[in-house]
Structure formats: C-alpha cells, structure tokens
Design a protein with these regions (language model features):
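Long, highly charged, low-complexity intrinsically disordered interaction regions
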Residues: 132-179
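Short intrinsically disordered, low-complexity coil segments enriched in acidic
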Residues: 1-2, 179
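Residues that scaffold, gate, or flank divalent-cation-dependent active/transport sites
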Residues: 2-109, 114-116, 122-134, 142-145, ...
Length: 179
C-alpha cells in the first residue's frame, strides 16, 4: 500500500517586491516591477498585483512594461536582502515542519507526513504558519496541500491572490488536474 503523504507548498508571491515594500513605504499600493535596471533589454522578473492589473507580466521587456503602465516603478533585485529574508522564512517554518525543501526565495515545500498527532491536520498547520508569517512580517502566502509536490505546487500557484489555501484530498488529484 502507498503511504499517505502530506506535502505543503508555501509560496509568498512576488517575494522580492514584498520585501522592498517592507523597507520602502512609497512602493506600497502602486505598480512595481522587479528587473535589472542598468540594461536596456532587461526583463521583468516579478510584478506587484497593481502592475499585473495594468497588464504587466513577468518575462516582459521593461520597455513594454513601461508603455503598458506609465506609473510603473522598476526596482532592481536585492539578492542579499532576499537571501536573508528567505533564511528567516526557513527558521519560521522549522517548528511546523521537520522535513522541508527550498524551491526558491519565498517558496518552500514542507513534508507534514506523520505530524498529525503533534500538530493536527496539515491544512490547519499550514493555516497557523500562514498567520504567523502575516503577523510577524506581513507576508501573505499561497498554500497548496496535497499528496505530492507537483499537485501541492499547482494547488498553490493557481490561486488568485494571497492569502489563500487549497487542499487537494487524496483521490481527487485527477479531477483537480483535469483541464
């Protein structure tokens, strides 16, 4: 028999923009894009919800992004701040998940298999973790809970806006993945 697994995918969308807004209040509630600033052909890496609403997408040229959204603020990546914040995120999840794996800054897989007696249902553990991140740093996350990484990742990344959670119960993966 297959062992039941509980895999959580936790993502803080536009993590670097979230961090920049924490440090610079003028970036809040306005369209922001993360891109290398000193290159004419720079591509947008992350966008705020406000920029997304104006049609700006990751992978787009900065030039096109500025045409679509004249009020766009383009900020450069800050890898040291991002890495430091990701380490803080890792520290924060340790009490909740004995086994975890980093995907990219602001994104983690947590293996909550076998932790139900200690922490309760995985979706409840994920909800407590989400609350802690919001209270401690103001980070809103998208969370997917499923039996494997692929389904939990899709469950998290296909949510509209954080904070949101989606749990795909064992046996319902096929229905969730169907087009």
């Amino acid at each position: 028999t297959l062992m039941h697994r509980d895999i959580v995918c936790l993502q803080i969308p536009s993590f670097e923009i979230v961090l920049a807004r924490t440090h610079e209040a003028s970036l809040r509630h306005r369209p922001v894009a993360l891109a290398p600033v000193h290159t004419p052909r720079g591509l947008v890496r992350e966008v705020s919800q406000e920029a997304l609403d104006d049609g700006v997408l990751p992978g787009m040229s900065v030039e096109l992004a500025r045409q679509l959204c004249p009020g766009l603020r383009v900020i450069p990546p800050d890898s040291s701040r991002t890495q430091a914040a990701h380490r803080e995120l890792q520290q924060a999840i340790m009490p909740f998940a004995p086994v975890w794996e980093s995907i990219q800054p602001g994104s983690l897989f947590l293996d909550l298999t076998g932790t139900q007696r200690l922490f309760g249902r995985p979706i409840d553990t994920a909800a407590r973790l989400e609350r802690e991140l919001t209270v401690k740093w103001g980070w809103h996350s998208q969370i997917g809970v499923a039996m494997n990484k692929l389904v939990s990742h899709l469950a998290a990344t296909t949510l509209e806006k954080p904070p949101q959670m989606r749990s795909i119960y064992s046996g319902s993966e096929q229905a969730f993945l169907a087009p």
